[in-house]
């Protein structure tokens, strides 16, 4: 019974952790749109704008990657099961 409860709570926690993937998707879309807008206004600064946009996208994506790691740990290498 306790094991089933821990597994169920872990599955729910993994699902909630994956909700964090929504934020990076929205942020990267917003950054790409603003980057395209900036290149349209100043085509000569395309290299600098692209570099800054890619750095921002990498930082935003790290949140989604951390959420994926937490979800995978909860599902496949659950440390809470060792407490039983």
Curated annotation (Swiss-Prot):
Transmembrane segments: 6-26, 64-84
An MF annotation (GO) of this entry: lipid binding
Documented activity regulation: Inhibited by dicyclohexylcarbodiimide; the enzyme is protected from inhibition by Na(+) in a pH-dependent manner.
Subcellular localization, as worded in the UniProt entry: Cell membrane
Pfam family, one: ATP-synt_C
Protein family membership: Belongs to the ATPase C chain family.
Protein name per Swiss-Prot or TrEMBL: ATP synthase subunit c, sodium ion specific
Organism of derivation: Clostridium paradoxum
